[in-house]
A protein has these predicted regions:
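Non-transmembrane, solvent-exposed beta-strand/loop segments in proteins
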Residues: 444-487, 491-674, 678-679, 701-708, ...
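Periplasmic-binding protein-like
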Residues: 127-141, 159-161, 201-207, 257-275, ...
């Protein structure tokens, strides 16, 4: 039985000094671990911010490269001038977003020549005095020719995608043309009118300027009469004081001519508009043809103020033919993507000027990348010369640039090579590909010319042969999409396919290039008839199609379902499939609503958009033909591609797949409130959460096919793994502090861990919300 100590009597042990563990030399352990933890957090934050800042500094520390553009932003050519500027700016913006050229951002100086010669010459001196390394523009020959000598004397590289004056490049070795010459365009137009359209008489109405109207008229007349046709020429005065008088004379002459033939307008669109209105209002309905200046939908829209046009769309322009370097309904996917981007950026449909000056900017940037530049005021002349040399070296497809519509390069005279001349026809206010095109035969030795000419498939103009290329207006109307199989990378589609064309019996001989199984027989259309001179075929097609799914953004992903076909018998020179914009009613806003109906069976996906593109399939095999052994053979077959963009419904997916992970985030965070006296329990909960999340990640990956990259959702799991690991390391550090009785340091460390945890989670959520802000539907 123990005896209680008497009051006032000290126990012997209380007199002994309390023994503490020996203190370590240096900084107290608790403070050391706390500082180490803070230092680790700072290193992570500073490393992230520093890396981002360095990358930004590297892209902005170098002086910007300066380019200039001279275009018409006011005056009669303001519309195409604005288009050209927007096309250039669109490409330069994309280059700057990607880091610029060799670390240099690109600045664009914009000069408005107002479609006025005197202003253009002043602009030329301003451009030369600026730090611009090269210039894009001018828009047309009437402005370019008078200022050409100024640019030549300054050795300033100039790239134009629209100036056609024949002599401008020969008079200036620093001028580079990405387009056709006046002679090429007018001569080809004459051949088309005579050989394809079958006209034997032509009335040439031209503006009396020496830079464009007169040489265009002369070239057309020379070729047309050389083929055996007859012409009459009628001049329209550019001088406003004389213009109405000459216009009245033109109308009077044509009104009293019973056989005016085709009326060829050798002039820019502003003058062509005046002539067309005068002719149509006086009842002259003869077919007309023009150069490329009026060749766009915007030209038809420019008549909207007239009552005749409002009551009957296309009243003035229906039946008008025009040449063009680019027709969007027969353009490849790259051009269609550009058109979509342009419309999203500027809210309007682009004409050919926008696309061609986008390509001019591509060539300019390629020259900047290859040139050796010091980019100082003292080196400006040498830098300009270096860029000119790089442009001059682009004399082959390999040395050139891959543009929107094919390779971009120059001949030795600095003229663009292989620039196509297409012909369009206005119909109900739209500029569409004409039913027959002319395609030059690049290697006549590989073609049985006599046989093909006898069959009416080719025509001869001098020493040049041309294929008569049939245009097939094609469209796909989606009826239903079902069974998107992620594992097999396929989807099932049910749709209608139609074609409208002249002549060619082989137009419907197609194969679906990405079909795994399809029910289609070209010999059994649902409907077969001839309408307005065009053969019309309608097919009902069902099948399974292969897809190339991209899961980098999973589950915030957008996928593209592609249905494409190609002709299996005729090459692309003989037949081309174009987008039937009228049949597809692409201009109507109800098109998207109709397309959404096809996806009603897909509960996990939402329809976003549909894009059509004329496509080309290339075969580089010689097929054992000895004539092809020593050639760079490339046989191309035309086709059409329909690309449907769909988007995963993110919110339902996140609710069903991430709810468990969210609970684990909360569980680990809740464990931080466990008393530091029970750090072992905290470790157990964290390890359990870590292992559970690993199992969840395996379940997510099992839903995807075998892919060799990390998807977006996986990064959330990886971040959670890192947080768990951080919590475990800190818990062990805090346990060590407890051993030394550093309670204050433990509390501070725990508070900091709370802050870091919440900060990481908040930053991750914000980042995903910002990056995928348009995907949460």
């Amino acid at each position: 039985m123990s005896q209680e100590p008497e009051p006032g009597v000290l126990h012997a042990q209380s007199l002994l000094p309390r023994v503490h563990p020996p203190a370590r030399r240096g900084r107290p352990p608790g403070r050391r671990y706390l500082l180490l933890f803070i230092l680790l957090a700072l290193v992570l934050v500073v490393g992230f911010v520093g890396t981002y800042s360095v990358s930004k500094l590297q892209s902005t520390s170098k002086a910007a490269y300066t380019l200039a553009i001279s275009t018409s932003l006011s005056g009669s050519q303001a519309a195409p001038g604005q288009e050209a500027l927007q096309g250039v700016q669109l490409y330069l913006d994309s280059v700057n977003r990607a880091g610029g050229v060799n670390g240099h951002t690109l600045d664009l100086l914009v000069f408005n020549d107002k479609d006025d010669v005197a202003t253009a010459q002043k602009v030329a001196h301003q451009v030369i005095a600026s730090p611009a390394l090269l210039m894009l523009g001018p828009l047309y020959s009437g402005i370019a020719v008078p200022s050409n000598q100024i640019y030549r004397n300054a050795h300033l590289p100039v790239i134009s995608a629209s100036v056609s004056n024949d002599a401008i490049t020969s008079n200036n070795p620093f001028f580079f043309r990405l387009g056709t010459t006046t002679t090429q365009e007018a001569s080809t137009s004459a051949t088309y009118a005579f050989q394809i359209l079958g006209f034997r008489n032509a009335s040439i109405v031209y503006t009396d300027d020496a830079t464009y109207g007169m040489p265009t008229a002369q070239s057309f007349a020379s070729t047309f009469t050389g083929d055996g046709g007859t012409v009459q020429t009628l001049a329209l005065a550019q001088n406003p004081a004389q213009r109405q008088k000459t216009l009245d004379a033109i109308v009077n002459t044509l009104a009293h001519n019973p056989k005016p033939g085709i009326i060829f307008l050798a002039m820019l669109d502003t003058y062509a508009r005046q002539v067309i209105v005068a002719l149509r209002q006086h009842g002259i309905i003869a077919p007309m043809m023009s150069t490329d200046s009026p060749g766009s939908d915007s030209f038809a829209a420019s008549f909207s103020s007239y009552p005749e046009e409002r009551s009957q769309p296309g009243y003035f322009t229906d039946g008008l033919y025009a040449s063009s370097p680019l027709l969007y309904d027969s353009a490849p996917a790259a051009v269609q993507n550009f058109s979509t981007l342009y419309q999203q950026t500027y809210g309007k449909v682009p004409g050919w000027h926008a696309a061609k000056y986008y390509e001019a900017a591509q060539v300019a940037v390629a020259a900047l990348q290859a040139a050796t530049l010091k980019n100082t005021s003292a080196s400006l002349s040498d830098d300009r010369m270096s860029i000119a040399e790089q442009l001059g070296s682009m004399t082959s497809p390999q040395a050139g640039v891959v543009g929107l519509d094919g390779p971009l390069y120059f001949d030795n005279a600095h003229n663009g090579v292989a620039i196509p001349i297409r012909f369009g026809q206005f119909s109900h206010g739209q500029f569409l590909s004409a039913p027959i095109q002319m395609v030059s035969i690049s290697n006549p030795a590989l073609v049985n010319l006599a046989s093909e000419e006898h069959a009416g498939n080719i025509i001869q103009v001098g020493k040049q042969y041309y294929w008569k290329q049939s245009v097939v207006y094609a469209g796909i109307d989606l009826k239903e999409v079902s069974n998107i199989n992620v594992t097999d990378s396929t989807f099932t589609a049910d749709f209608y396919l139609w074609m409208r064309y002249i002549g060619s019996a082989n137009a419907t001989n197609i194969s679906f290039t990405n079909a795994s199984s399809v029910m289609f027989d070209p010999s059994t259309p649902v409907t077969s008839q001839t309408i307005n001179g065009l053969q019309y075929r309608l097919y009902h097609v069902t099948g399974d199609f292969k897809a190339d799914y991209d899961y980098h953004d999973y589950p915030f992903d957008q996928q593209q379902l592609i249905i494409s076909f190609q002709n299996t018998l005729l090459t692309g020179d003989q037949l081309v499939y174009v987008i039937d914009t009228q049949g597809l009613q692409l201009e109507q806003h109800t098109t998207m609503d109709d397309a959404k109906v096809a996806f009603q069976l897909l509960s996990s996906w939402t329809y976003r958009s549909t894009q059509y593109a004329s496509d080309t399939f290339t075969n580089r095999s010689t097929l054992g033909n000895p004539l092809l052994f020593n050639t760079q053979v490339r046989t191309e077959y035309s086709g059409l591609e329909m690309t449907i963009t769909i988007q995963r419904k993110v919110i339902p997916y996140l609710i069903s797949h991430l709810l468990a992970l969210v609970l684990l985030f909360l569980l680990v965070y809740a464990s931080l409130f466990i008393s530091t006296k029970h750090l072992g329990d905290r470790l157990v909960l964290t390890v359990t959460a870590l292992l559970t999340s690993a199992v969840l990640l395996l379940a997510v990956n099992s839903e995807l096919p075998a892919i060799g990259y990390v998807v977006s959702l996986s990064y959330i799991y990886y971040i959670f793994f890192a947080i768990c690991l951080l919590c475990m390391i800190v818990a062990l550090m805090m346990e060590k502090m407890e051993e030394y009785g550093k309670d204050t340091a433990v509390r501070r460390t725990n508070i900091i861990l709370h802050i870091i945890y919440l900060t990481i989670v908040t930053v991750v959520v914000i980042c995903y919300m910002v990056i995928y802000s348009n995907r949460f539907i």
